[in-house]
């Protein structure tokens, strides 16, 4: 197996270990709790990994994907039992594992297919300036949430196939739980359906979907007036 593929698997194992540590940390101090109030801010980070690719929107498979995000959030609305947050995320590191392409003859056509044994890591970075999250049970320690984000990613090579593009749009939506183990500190565990596509800006646009499982940490504050 290629060394870069091994690095991705090690990254996934490390992410799982971090998630377990965060969960244990939350369990150790879960009695503190937190109430999300309008105007409060959060700063944090999360990392996620997708070992496989569904084909709900994109049609490309065999593309394990992972990313590390830095996140800022601000509570826009706070009601009795829920709160709405605006989010912006920076993606300093994104990595997708994809094989090289080779040309084969199928009938009267020359088509590109994945070349076996050529899996390699392609790195990228980006930003998601559009993001919303709704936290339920906003006065409780364990707060389920749903969220969605939209942004762009730029890779060092064409993704997810040759003839596509280094520049891709990225959208994602999902759910999770935010655990306030201290009044101003929390960990999050969640799932996000993630899709990247060049929106037909290149000759090929098969798109790629990911089942992104992630864990994160955030620190919250509210300026006093």
Describe the role of every protein-language-model region:
Residues 55-59, 113-119, 157-163, 199-205:
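Extracellular loop and loop/strand-boundary signature of outer-membrane beta-barrel proteins
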Residues 29-76, 210-225:
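Short glycine/proline- and aromatic-enriched beta-strand/turn motifs that initiate or cap beta-hairpins
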Residues 31-41, 76-85, 137-144, 181-186, ...:
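Short loop/turn motifs that connect adjacent beta-strands in outer-membrane beta-barrel proteins
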Residues 34-39, 176-225:
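Predominantly the C-terminal beta-signal and adjacent terminal strand-loop region
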Residues 66-158, 218:
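Gram-negative (and chloroplast) outer-membrane scaffold detector with strong preference
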């Amino acid at each position: 197996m290629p060394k870069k593929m091994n690095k991705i698997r090690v990254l996934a194992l490390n992410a799982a270990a971090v998630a377990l540590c965060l969960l244990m940390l939350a369990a150790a101090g879960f009695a503190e709790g937190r109430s999300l109030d309008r105007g409060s801010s959060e700063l944090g980070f999360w990392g996620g990994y997708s070992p496989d690719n569904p084909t709900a929107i994109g049609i490309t498979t065999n593309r394990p994907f992972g990313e590390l995000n830095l996140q800022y959030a601000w509570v826009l609305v706070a009601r009795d039992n829920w709160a709405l947050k605006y989010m912006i995320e920076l993606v300093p590191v994104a990595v997708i594992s994809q094989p090289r392409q080779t040309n084969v003859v199928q009938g009267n056509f020359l088509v590109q297919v994945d070349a076996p044994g050529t899996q390699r890591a392609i790195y990228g970075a980006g930003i998601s300036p559009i993001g919303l999250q709704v936290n339920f049970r906003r006065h409780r320690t364990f707060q389920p949430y749903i969220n969605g984000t939209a942004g762009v990613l730029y890779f060092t090579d064409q993704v997810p196939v040759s003839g596509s593009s280094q520049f891709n749009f990225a959208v994602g939506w999902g759910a999770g739980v935010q655990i306030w183990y201290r009044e101003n500190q929390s960990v999050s565990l969640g799932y996000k359906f993630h899709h990247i596509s060049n929106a037909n800006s290149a000759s090929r646009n098969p798109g790629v979907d990911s089942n992104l499982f992630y864990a994160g940490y955030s620190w919250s504050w509210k300026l006093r007036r």
